Amino acid sequence: LNHESRMETVQTAFWVVALLVVLALMFDFMNGFHDAANSIATVVSTGVLKPAQAVLFAAFFNFVAIFIFHLSVAATVGKGIVQPGIVDTHVVFGALLGAITWNVITWYYGIPSSSSHALIGGISGAVIAKAGTSALVAAGILKTVAFIFVSPLLGFTLGSLMMVAVAWIFRSFRPSRVDKWFRRLQLISAGAYSLGHGGNDAQKTIGIIWMLLLATGYASAEDKSPPSWTIVSCYMAIGLGTMFG
């Protein structure tokens, strides 16, 4: 190839990567949009915040998570579930398109679902279609699948225990006094939930963009963390999605 042909190839590759990054950020936006109701349901239903105030509140904490959470989830998605060398632009496109499509379908029909599960399933399905099940990292997949099942059970157990404990502790208090304090405490719980949502789910998109950059040579396998712009843009995208949700 002459110099002009090489430059054209690099430029084409760059635009393919850029479009896939935009698609990943669209998924991240949809994640925030799709899951916004989970973050604000309690504070809106009890009248602690108006809907517009609640989404701004949740979006703020989605983004603030950037300063608190370590990038361990991004590392798992980016390097821990697929064998090196398997991922290419086609795999990333298939994974993102599948996850976005499922998110839109479940949102439209009002079906409770997880954007995280959709993304992990999309990645796994695209990789299996390309190279078979041997291309998956068994330890990473098993850990992810285990937590998919453990999380709701753990949430149910802890929620039940907390409800029993709170009812017992405040059994002799006047309802008006309890209501006053718990309306304030709901802000803390909603903020903590939004913080966790941003810190966990934004990192999954960071991970898939990092996976894409590694596959296309725009990042090195020796890098300990993804580029800063991916981190900032993903946290902004999920925050904006929540704001519009």
Annotate the PLM regions.
Residues H3-G245:
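Multi-pass alpha-helical transmembrane bundle typical of ion/small-solute transporters
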